[in-house]
């Protein structure tokens, strides 16, 4: 299931995934992708960037680059991973998969039958760039870079939860944050808002008051 979820995070448009899943081999998928693109199908939703990295990606299309990672994922024995953290650790060893994408796969994986009882279900998260900057802002840092270690930010998020949030949120809201990724998402959105508010970045999307 891990390779299929990785496919879902690479091609994150539901109407496209109907034609691409399950992943079998690169050639067949590239053929289908090319046909869908030629027919005007939207392949990516733009929720996050999918860049090609380093010398491994030189001369390759985005499709080829990430499909090679999906193929490599089909050769891993994921049953040997006992925690979400171990899945993420193994994912980032695949060429082309960074911490952000690995965390997104694990965010989905925790809601599958095989992983709903993972021992780190309520605690695991890999903090992406936006989450890191959001945590820095809460710590009082202006124009943050989010360049400290993953361990630092994981500890900062745990401290934020334990000391500031766990006994102050209404039960209905708190239920959502049992999945630590939801807190991570809030920190990322907070960073986007603050970057625009302080003139650190251009506004790409309009904020709508509810």
Where does each model-flagged region fall?
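Structure-specific DNA junction-binding interface
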Residues: 1-56, 210
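A general marker of short, structured functional hotspots
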Residues: 7, 27, 44, 61-62, ...
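A contiguous catalytic/ligand-binding core that recognizes phosphate-bearing ligands
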Residues: 34-90
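C-terminal accessory module of base-excision DNA glycosylases/AP lyases that mediates lesion recognition
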Residues: 63-77, 81-86, 103-210
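Acyl activation and transfer enzymes in specialized metabolism, enriched
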Residues: 94-95
């Amino acid at each position: 299931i891990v390779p299929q979820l990785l496919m879902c995070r690479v091609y994150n448009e539901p109407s496209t995934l109907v034609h691409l899943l399950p992943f079998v081999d690169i050639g067949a998928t590239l053929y289908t992708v090319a046909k869908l693109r030629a027919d005007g199908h939207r392949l990516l939703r733009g929720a996050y960037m999918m860049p090609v990295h380093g010398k491994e990606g030189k001369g390759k299309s985005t499709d080829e680059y990430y499909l090679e990672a999906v193929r490599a994922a089909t050769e891993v024995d994921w049953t040997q991973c006992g925690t979400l953290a171990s899945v993420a650790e193994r994912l980032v060893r695949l060429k082309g998969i960074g911490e952000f994408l690995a965390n997104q796969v694990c965010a989905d994986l925790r809601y599958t039958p095989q992983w709903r009882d993972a021992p780190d279900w309520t605690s695991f998260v890999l903090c992406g760039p936006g989450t890191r900057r959001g945590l820095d802002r809460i710590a009082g840092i202006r124009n943050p870079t989010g360049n400290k270690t993953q361990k630092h930010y994981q500890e900062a998020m745990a401290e934020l939860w334990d000391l500031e949030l766990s006994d102050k949120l209404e039960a209905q809201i708190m239920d959502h944050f049992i999945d630590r990724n939801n807190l991570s998402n809030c920190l990322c959105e907070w960073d986007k808002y603050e970057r625009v508010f302080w003139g650190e970045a251009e506004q790409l999307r309009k904020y709508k008051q509810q």
